[in-house]
Each structure stands twice: as C-alpha cells, then as structure tokens.
Amino acid sequence: MAIDLMRRHGYDGVSVDAIVEAAGIGRTTFFRYFGTKPGVIWYAFDDTIARLEAELRDAPGDLGAMEAVRRAVVSSTRSAVYDSDVWLERFDLLDSSPSLRVGASEHWELWKRAIAGHLARHTGGSATDATPMAAAGACQGVFVAELRGRLSGDGRDAFVERLDRSLAPVTGVLDQLFRTDG
C-alpha cells in the first residue's frame, strides 16, 4: 500500500501519516515494523541480502566461487520478486527520489559485502581486500544496470532471466581470479 502511494504521488509527496491512514494502522505500529519512512523501501532489499548471504553460505563446495555468486544473486532475486508484488517497483522510487538515494550506498555496501565475504572465504583472504570487493562491485553494476534497464511491463521472469544472462559473462571472466585449483 505504501509503495503504491509513493508511486502515485512520489516518495517525497507521501507522509508517514498518509501511509498509516491508508493502511489503517497507528504510527507506533508503522515505526515498529519499518523504523523509518525509507525503511518501507529498503526492508525488502535487506531481506534479499540476508537471503543472498544464506545462499552463498550454503553453496556447494565444489562450485566455483563466481558461479556460486551468480546462482545466489539470481536465486535470491527470484525469491524476492516473487515474494512481493512491488519488489522491483521499489527501485523505480530509489532512482527517482534524491532523498532515498542518500541512504542507498549503505544498503548496496551490505549487498556487496555479502558477495565479497563469500569470495574471501573461498580464497582465505579478507572481505575488504580489493579483489573480492571489485568483483562484488562488478556484480552490483550488472544488477543495477538490469534494474534500470527494465522495461515497463516486463514480467518478473524476463527480468530474472536477463539478470542471469548478464551476470554469466561477468562472473565467468572474474572466476579465474578466485580459482583455488592452481
């Protein structure tokens, strides 16, 4: 409901009071669930990060590091877009609202660190090392490009398939950086 209001009136054009009134809840309930107005936008992405971390943690040991990343990004994103009718639309709001972009780097940094952490565990390095962070940044670049390149009316399947196709060559090239087989 809040996302629909924000899509119609713009993020800055919708107050917390308007959201709680439309939802029929109190301000206390709103803040208990979301913490802040930007939390309405970001909570689903934060859940996706947790899912991504779990998928990377549970990846088969014989799978290449970057192949595990590609599969985990696609799988966690697929779950997210099917768990919410407006998951993808949140990113339209992020791109169109300067006040939301202010906090975006914090959330994207968590997304990148999930990937960099997996890559570091795979090679015995640190998640803050340049190579894992650069590889995670490349994956983020693909992800953001696909979010921004999404056509209106694109179905969820089309988005997830395009994300997978776009990640494949990038993760394929980066895989050689994380091979441990000599």
Predicted regions and their residues:
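Residues that scaffold, gate, or flank divalent-cation-dependent active/transport sites
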Residues: W87
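An amphipathic alpha-helix adjacent to DNA-recognition modules
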Residues: I3, D12-G13, E21-G24, Y33-R70, ...
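Hydrophobic alpha-helical bundle segments that form small-molecule/ligand-binding pockets
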Residues: Y82, S97, E109-A136
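Residues within helix-turn-helix
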Residues: D17, T28
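Hydrophobic/aromatic-rich alpha-helical bundle segments in the mid-to-C-terminal region
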Residues: H122-A168
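Hydrophobic/aromatic residues within well-ordered alpha-helical segments
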Residues: T48, V73, H107-W111, I115, ...
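Small/polar (Gly/Ser/Thr/Ala-rich) solvent-exposed segments
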Residues: A104
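C-terminal peripheral helix-coil segments that are non-catalytic and often amphipathic
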Residues: G117, G155-G182
